[in-house]
Amino acid sequence: MARIGIFPASGALGTSTYTNLLSQVPNNQVTLINRYPEKVPKKYVENGVTVRQASYESSAEDLEAVFAGVDILFLISYPSPVHLYRTKVQTKALNAAQKAGVKHIFYSSLAYALVNAESAKAVVMAAHLDSEAHLKQLARANSGLSWTSIREGLYAESFPVYSGLPGFNNPPSTIRIPEDPNGPGVSWVRQDELGEGSARLIASYAKSPSTFEYTNKIVTLSGPKSWTWAEAVEVLSRVTGKNISIEKVSLEEYKNQPQMKAYFGTEETANTLDSAWEAIRGGEAAGVTTTLAEILGREPQSFEKTIEECVKKQASQE
């Protein structure tokens, strides 16, 4: 079997993906690359997993060296909404992978655009579109390279970030958002199921590249339905047992809520919210596909069930 690499093998999506992947493929065929390889659980290393040290801040030469010998690479996008820097470091990594001889690149994109669209309103999507375009260009110029872009849906676990909540428990009596509560919503999806779905795609390609149906294609993994903000708040009310209303406010009022300033820190980052809500208003976060269900072999977990889990988890930590 081909050697599989994950970079960076850290964070929620990276950890979920390699944890699921290691139950599907021989561990001695997997290379995990991250900034702190010593943090990879020892049980995986003892089972044959190779660990290497690198990050997006590594030089192009160092990235090429750690990608050497890897046939299939899962490149997880750089965790920043800053467009140009994100594009710069991801382009460097993609070029290094091609030079190292990687044969197929899976890229973790974002489902913040209409399904299969090549343009989007959300600034946070811009670097993903750049990287998808660069992958296509690399593949056209190099016959030995192919790609799959996995557009991952918005995490249900991130609902508090968008809705301006300090957390899942003890929500305020009124949630304030800069949008019509009954307008286009979000097809929320459980984060670990995105990791599992990504792992299954990688394992499927590794086992039979010639029959893999998503070669040189974009695949969108979403939740099973789109929830309006009013519906989502109803779920939170039901799960927490509290009567919560939702109110449309101006974008400035929304951004000036203390919890939003705490989430986003800098004005530059907070300003990505302007385009994010424009995208939501245009239905660009509401796309639903059956692909994740087909890959998992079951219906993805409902938004309500995931919120229940999040509320219980947070309560146990308080």
Where are these regions (language model features)?
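Short loop/helix-cap segments at secondary-structure boundaries that form the rim of catalytic
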Residues: 39-47
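Conserved Rossmann-fold cofactor-binding substructure of NAD(P)-dependent oxidoreductases
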Residues: 50-71
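Short, amphipathic alpha-helical "lid/cap" segments that border enzyme active or binding sites
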Residues: 64, 91-94, 191-199, 303-308
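NAD(P)-cofactor binding segment of oxidoreductase domains
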Residues: 66-105, 129-137
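Terminal hydrophobic/aromatic helix or amphipathic segment near a protein terminus
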Residues: 221, 231-282
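Amphipathic terminal alpha-helices
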Residues: 291-318
